[in-house]
Swiss-Prot record:
Keywords: DNA recombination, Meiosis, Mitochondrion, Transit peptide. It comes from Eremothecium gossypii (strain ATCC 10895 / CBS 109.51 / FGSC 9923 / NRRL Y-1056) (Yeast). It comes from the Eukaryota. Residues 1-27 form a transit peptide. The keyword Membrane does not apply. GO terms for cellular component: mitochondrion. This is Meiotic sister-chromatid recombination protein 6, mitochondrial. The keyword Mitochondrion applies. May be involved in the control of meiotic sister-chromatid recombination. GO terms for biological process: DNA recombination; meiotic cell cycle.
Length: 670
């Protein structure tokens, strides 16, 4: 029997609940339904687009003049957007001779002008026309469409957010046709605030440049100017790039920037290399972070400078950040320090600061204290920045009271990490609400104050919940104004610092109530599930998952973002507690995964196999049901994944599993 009967029942119940909660699309207004029907009839003519456009204009104007629809209603409706996009596509194909026609069709640009006049043009229509014009080499006309788009946006109730990067990318490509590109001119063209270089959609331009059908000469211009813009950001705007752009990057964009940096001939810049190292490790790409280090050391002739060595401490610390046993991770930090820093005649403040930061990442606050007392020279302890890093470590120590900490603070806190640590200690100390507000106002408001980070705002949410008159009705997203672009980052930080199950449940409910469904995604739910496991509450984690898949109208509720935290969470419970009963939970969620994926993702395999190996090493008592899951499902999937996709686990995992004679490890895995 492949799966246990109990596990099958659990999976079936989940799937039935999911299937029974399909949410229908909101109904359109009757007037729009009438217009949709008339337009569908008008557009039946597949050959004479000129006649179609004339009939379209007559139909829309007739409905408007009869008082059925206002310009505002037309601007807000998207019910006919796709059908009108097909007209643009048909025009393009007829002009290229792909579709026969008895008349000369209106061009996509002419159709767009009509749609703009009728208040029916949408962002995707501007994109289609710009793509058509760029493919035909008409950059100036494409930029004219961009200007029309900006006029259209000014009429809309709100900008279109991340999706706007496509039309911005087409405008950028048109600009690249015209000559040598300048990053400040491009930013101005895109109608973005001066100095906000992060708004330039470079990654989208990378994606689209080869998909438009540009001539070879124009494609060359685009590639050359794209490289020039990257170089200007990396070299001329290096400070902004390191401080603003890199910390907000996730993997695809970060990897793209690193490739551009690597392609710059003769550039050996340890500040940039260190920036890439730290940010790759920030998103968990530790192997790539080490590649950055090795590449930079090679370029530097085998002698890493102080900046690179300091970054190495951060990377090694983050490698051990999620380790169950952080003693070994601390030993690796000590090994790096002894190998790379002890040999220096003079160790500067920046390196001691990097060492303290590494220990703070590992939550080894006792080590922060001992390094401060035993290793750091007295004259360096007077350094303002180093002192604040040390005090950050003190703020996290449970044996340092809030009054003791406040006595040691400088008059003005200028390190945002220290400020956040102080706020967090206040949020976790009863009766400190007024003190919290006073410190926040002094540090983050007024002239010369610090800029709040996502962690700052997350800590305000934590304090807001702790002091709410009725926590059961507290809405996190009504409590503190959060910029739209920071919402996800603030949510992630809150879930890292929250250790209260009831607060996590309330945060989930607040998210459902306050955020649009495209924002309240499975990624967010996965983070909430992960947070529940981190505080040891697997029952809340499961309850949130089940509620999400049965009440959300997201297109795909069961995916890697929601399943991986469950599989990782139960695997970690097995590792921490040597508790084999959680294998039945893994069995359930593996079955769900098998219904979503043709191949079980590698992350699932690795987490589960590591948990099984731990049980075998500790000689845990497994039931027949457990052995059936391991042998019939896990081992067979590991073998198939290696054969089909080349997935290979650490050999030590298999070696540990073979200690249990009742588990049959396929020979090809050994």
């Amino acid at each position: 029997m492949l799966f246990s009967r109990a596990s099958k029942i659990r999976v079936s119940q989940l799937m039935r609940r999911l299937q029974s909660t399909a949410v229908g699309r909101a109904a359109s207004r009757p007037e729009m339904l009438q217009l949709e029907a008339k337009l569908a009839d008008v557009m039946k003519d597949k050959k004479d687009l000129g006649r179609v456009m004339a009939a379209l204009r007559e139909t829309v104007q007739g409905v408007v003049e009869s008082g059925g629809l206002s310009d505002r209603t037309l601007l807000r409706s998207n019910s006919v957007t796709n059908d009108l996009g097909k007209l643009l596509e048909q025009s393009n194909k007829q002009l290229r001779g792909e579709i026969e026609t008895d008349t000369v069709p209106p061009t996509p640009y002419e159709i767009l002008v009509t749609l703009v006049d009728l208040k029916l043009a949408r962002r995707t229509h501007y994109e289609q026309v710009m793509q058509y014009l760029l493919a035909n080499g008409d950059a100036e006309a494409a930029l004219g469409v961009w200007v029309k788009y900006l006029e259209f946006v000014a009429q809309m109730p709100q900008r279109e957010g991340a999706e706007e990067t496509y039309v911005m990318a087409y405008a950028s490509i048109a600009y690249f046709f015209l000559g040598a590109a300048d990053v400040d001119v491009l930013l101005q063209l895109l109608n973005r605030e001066a100095g906000q270089y992060k708004d330039i959609p470079l990654f989208r331009i990378e994606q689209l440049q080869s998909q438009i059908g540009l001539s070879e000469s124009n494609l060359t211009k685009v590639r050359e100017n794209l490289a020039a813009i990257h170089k200007q950001l990396l070299v001329d705007k290096k400070g902004y790039f390191l401080d603003v752009i890199l910390p907000e990057c996730y993997y695809p964009l970060l990897h793209s920037y690193y490739k551009r940096y690597s392609d710059l001939e003769g550039l050996v810049d340890e500040d940039l290399a260190a920036g890439f190292m730290i940010n790759f490790s920030r998103i968990g790409k530790h192997t790539l972070a080490m590649k950055c280090y090795n590449d930079a050391v090679k370029k530097a002739g085998g002698k890493p400078g102080v900046v690179l060595k300091n970054a190495l401490l951060t990377v090694v610390a983050r490698m051990g950040e999620t380790a169950i046993n952080r003693v070994n991770a601390t030993r690796r930090i000590e090994a790096v320090w002894n190998s790379y820093f002890r040999e220096d005649d003079v160790i500067d403040v920046s390196s001691y600061k990097a060492l303290l930061n590494a220990l703070i990442i590992l939550k080894r606050f006792d080590k922060v204290q001992s390094v401060w007392e035993l290793d750091i020279p007295e004259e360096l302890k007077k350094d303002h920045t180093l002192l604040q890093t040390y005090l950050e470590g003190c703020a996290h120590r449970t044996n340092v009271s809030l009054p003791e900490l406040l006595k040691q603070l400088p008059e003005a806190v200028t390190d945002v990490n220290l400020a956040n640590a102080v706020l967090l200690k206040m949020a976790n100390t009863s009766g400190s609400a007024s003190m919290f507000d006073s410190f926040y106002d002094k540090t983050f408001k007024g002239p010369g104050s610090l800029r709040p980070t996502p962690l700052t705002l997350a800590t305000r949410l934590l304090m807001g919940y702790a002091t709410a008159s009725d926590p059961a009705k507290f809405n996190f997203f009504d409590h503190t104004p959060i910029p739209r672009t920071m919402k996800n980052a603030v949510a992630e930080e809150f879930l890292k610092i929250c250790s209260d199950s009831e607060a996590i449940k309330r945060f989930y409910e607040s998210s459902k109530a306050s955020l649009k469904l495209d924002v309240f995604s499975s990624r967010r739910v996965g983070k909430i599930i992960e947070a529940s496991f981190n505080i040891g509450d697997w029952k809340t984690a499961e309850a949130i998952f089940k509620d999400h898949i049965t009440t959300s109208n997201a297109k795909s509720q069961i995916n890697v973002h929601t399943l991986l935290p469950l599989i990782a969470g139960f695997s970690n419970l097995i590792l921490r507690n040597n508790e084999p009963s959680f294998l039945s939970k893994l069995d359930t969620y593996w079955q769900l995964a098998s219904r979503v994926y043709k191949t079980i993702p590698f992350e699932f395999l690795n987490k589960t196999a590591t948990a099984v190996a731990s049980l075998c090493l500790k000689e845990a008592k497994l039931t027949d049901e457990h052995y059936n899951f391991i042998n019939a499902v896990v081992m067979s999937e590991l073998a198939r994944s290696k054969k089909d996709h080349g997935y290979v686990l650490n050999a030590r995992i298999y070696h540990s599993i073979t200690k249990d004679q009742k588990i049959s490890v396929p020979p090809e895995l050994l």
